[in-house]
């Protein structure tokens, strides 16, 4: 906790091509070592691949994919009487989008395709069709929350 009050929340600027803050956040997640130009090139190439393969607008497919990835529930560890319980809690909207983007990028990086553009495009298409690693992660998170429903009364 900072001594001098809370730190102000910084807002991201919408990206110049699609005018979307969500796209900017995804670029920031893809970016490594401050190389924003490389991250933008990867994302826009991936969007071109998505549009080509799906025949729909890439932003629509991307937003559908993110909605399929974002978790509603997660578990948090809570210590009660000397033992740790996995307590299911609802995920705040800001954290939902952050987790969705993080999982999308992480599971894209784990894929087997040759270039990052192809990996990201295929993960977005898979997520839009409710398949793929990122959607599986969301399902696993929900299963954990469901399995620990008995400890829901420990919520704080």
Swiss-Prot record:
Q: Name one Pfam family in it.
A: Ribosomal_S7
Q: One MF term in GO for this entry?
A: tRNA binding
Task: List the GO terms this entry assigns under cellular component, sorted alphabetically.
Answer: small ribosomal subunit
Q: Which GO terms describe its biological process?
A: translation
Task: Give the matching Gene3D superfamilies.
Answer: Ribosomal protein S7 domain (1.10.455.10)
Q: Which InterPro entries match?
A: Ribosomal_uS7, Ribosomal_uS7_bac/org-type, Ribosomal_uS7_CS, Ribosomal_uS7_dom, Ribosomal_uS7_dom_sf
Is Lyase a UniProt keyword of this protein?
Answer: no
What keywords were assigned to this record?
Answer: Ribonucleoprotein, Ribosomal protein, RNA-binding, rRNA-binding, tRNA-binding
List the CDD domains.
uS7_Bacteria
Q: Quaternary structure?
A: Part of the 30S ribosomal subunit. Contacts proteins S9 and S11.
Question: Entry's NCBIfam families?
Answer: rpsG_bact
Question: What is stated as this protein's family in its record?
Answer: Belongs to the universal ribosomal protein uS7 family.
- Described purpose of this protein according to its UniProt entry: One of the primary rRNA binding proteins, it binds directly to 16S rRNA where it nucleates assembly of the head domain of the 30S subunit. Is located at the subunit interface close to the decoding center, probably blocks exit of the E-site tRNA.
What is the designated name of this protein? Small ribosomal subunit protein uS7
Source species, please?
Staphylococcus carnosus (strain TM300)
The lineage, from the top, is:
Bacteria, Bacillati, Bacillota, Bacilli, Bacillales
